[in-house]
A protein has these predicted regions:
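Classical Sec-dependent N-terminal signal peptides that target proteins to the secretory pathway
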Residues: 2-22
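Generic hydrophobic, helix-prone segments enriched in Leu/Val/Ile
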Residues: 4, 135-137, 174, 202
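Intrinsically disordered, low-complexity segments enriched in glycine/proline and serine/threonine
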Residues: 6, 11, 47, 102-106, ...
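Intrinsically disordered, low-complexity segments enriched in Ser/Pro/Gly/Ala and basic residues
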Residues: 10-12, 130-138, 159, 197
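Short helix-to-loop capping/linker segments positioned immediately adjacent to catalytic or ligand/cofactor-binding
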Residues: 11, 118-121, 146-147
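Acidic, serine/threonine-rich low-complexity disordered tracts
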Residues: 21-101, 142-219
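Hydrophobic, well-structured mid-protein blocks that either form specific transmembrane helices
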Residues: 90-136
Length: 219
């Protein structure tokens, strides 16, 4: 019995060493040519509750996002969030909110998207724009490809990613990164680079589609 307990303790310890990184508060700034900027902040708001938020300005759009989440056995548990995206000065808007509630044994996402309101039952963990990368840093750095649940506009979708290690020049120095590329069937693209060190910072983000291409870099 003692051996079994010791094995479980060692197994959990080494799993944590392999799959987890230290989640610490931060304030990061990203820029995009010619005048784009993003401020992203991670705050610890209670013993096991975190808030990640970002505010971005670009000639094509402005975006404000916030997510509240906790961590359970190396998994991000998204509790609530919102996104306010205004394109071309408000010509197109994407405003949405979501919150996880319990109804008996069920977990429900209560959401609003524009004028639409609704709720759906959830059975698995899911992520939004901000928590997706945190979960990937915790569990998917060693996987060459994977699928992950993503919540957007009242629906849970499945995103597929490829992951490979690359060496790039960043701030005039060679840096090893994990390069994550979303697999899509349309003409949009999304890719981000995570530095392979203890902090696991996202140092570059590439996104685009019909009529726009935006590259962000950590200042």
């Amino acid at each position: 019995m003692v051996k079994n307990i010791l094995f479980k303790v060692l197994f959990c310890f080494f799993c944590n060493q392999i799959f987890l990184f230290d989640l610490n508060p931060y304030e990061n700034y990203y820029s995009s040519k010619p005048t784009g900027s993003v401020k992203e902040t991670l705050e610890k708001i209670s013993e096991n509750s975190w808030k990640i938020s970002s505010f971005g300005k670009h000639p094509l759009f402005t975006i404000k996002q916030e997510s509240i989440f906790s961590i359970d056995n190396g998994n991000v548990i998204l509790e609530s969030g919102f996104r306010k995206l205004d394109v071309l000065g408000g010509l197109r808007k994407d405003h949405q909110t979501y919150k996880v509630e319990k109804e008996g044994d069920q977990k429900i996402i209560v959401y609003s998207f524009g004028k639409k309101k609704g709720s759906i039952e959830i059975e698995e963990n899911f992520y939004d724009n901000l928590t997706l990368q945190i979960q990937i840093k915790m569990n998917y750095l060693k996987k060459d490809e994977f699928k992950i649940n993503y919540f957007d506009k009242g629906k849970i979708k499945i995103k597929s990613f490829l992951n490979k290690k690359e060496e790039i020049i960043y701030k005039s120095k060679p840096v090893e990164v994990f390069e994550f590329t979303e697999q899509r069937e349309d003409k949009r693209y999304f890719k981000f680079l995570i530095r392979n060190d203890s902090d696991k910072e996202t140092i570059k983000v590439f996104q685009g589609g019909r009529g726009f291409n935006v590259d962000w870099e950590l200042d």
